[in-house]
Amino acid sequence: MYDVNEWKHVFKLDPNKDLPDEQLERLCESGTDAIVIGGSDNITEDNVLRLMSKVRRFLVPCVLEVSTIDSIVPGFDLYFIPSVLNSKKADWIVGMHHQAMKEYGELMSMEEIVTEGYCIVNPDCKAAALTEADTHIETEDILAYARVAEHLLHLPIFYLEYSGMLADIEMVEKTKAVLDKSVLFYGGGIKDAETAERFGRHADVIVVGNAVYEDFDQALKTVAAVKTK
């Protein structure tokens, strides 16, 4: 079984976006710790299966980050289930999780399921709109959500999601300081090796997503920047 505590870097791929097979191969063989498949727009069973089947040709762990119940398909190494702690809508905190367990609980291995305590901070990102996240929050609120994730809910992952914008690095450092057992994932604005290395000093795992589609070669360099620290 894969241990996220040992990870430092993941690529997040959107099944609704096109990526040439040659680039996908380079990502999968880059040394990244996992390929996470997920997104906010038009995530369907068909496009999830299509991308998973391509990633499955390689040895890298393949993870589905579940955003819709309809996109849950067998064949992934792990299933990340986001619980958006700062969502105004209960469905995104526990409601959809209940529905997923109701429909698929008997079919899924619980060892393959990893719950992420999400805190979405960028007010302009699609994930914030989709989940109705309260992004008008202070530093103290983010730290409180981190403590909720670890100490009250005992979640293995706390995911600080800036999705397209770069966080204040002091925010990441402060968040890491209040976590002991929960693994800190950071995503948002990581577009080159220098930024990845800088944020990788504080976050346990750096997530690189948009950069794959915007500047592939720079995105690829983030692996070595984080993994050799």
Curated annotation (Swiss-Prot):
Give the superkingdom in one word: Bacteria
Matching CDD domains: PcrB_like (cd02812)
* Enzyme Commission numbers on file: 2.5.1.n9
Q: What is its cofactor?
A: Mg(2+)
Q: What does this protein do?
A: Prenyltransferase that catalyzes in vivo the transfer of the heptaprenyl moiety of heptaprenyl pyrophosphate (HepPP; 35 carbon atoms) to the C3 hydroxyl of sn-glycerol-1-phosphate (G1P), producing heptaprenylglyceryl phosphate (HepGP). This reaction is an ether-bond-formation step in the biosynthesis of archaea-type G1P-based membrane lipids found in Bacillales.
Tell me what this protein is called: Heptaprenylglyceryl phosphate synthase
* One Pfam family recorded for the sequence: PcrB
Organism of origin? Bacillus velezensis (strain DSM 23117 / BGSC 10A6 / LMG 26770 / FZB42)
Gene Ontology biological-process entries: glycerophospholipid biosynthetic process
What are the recorded GO MF terms, alphabetically? heptaprenylglyceryl phosphate synthase activity; magnesium ion binding
Known catalysed reaction(s)?
A: sn-glycerol 1-phosphate + all-trans-heptaprenyl diphosphate = 3-heptaprenyl-sn-glycero-1-phosphate + diphosphate
Q: Which Gene3D superfamilies match?
A: FMN-linked oxidoreductases (3.20.20.390)
Q: Which residues bind Mg(2+)?
A: D14, S40
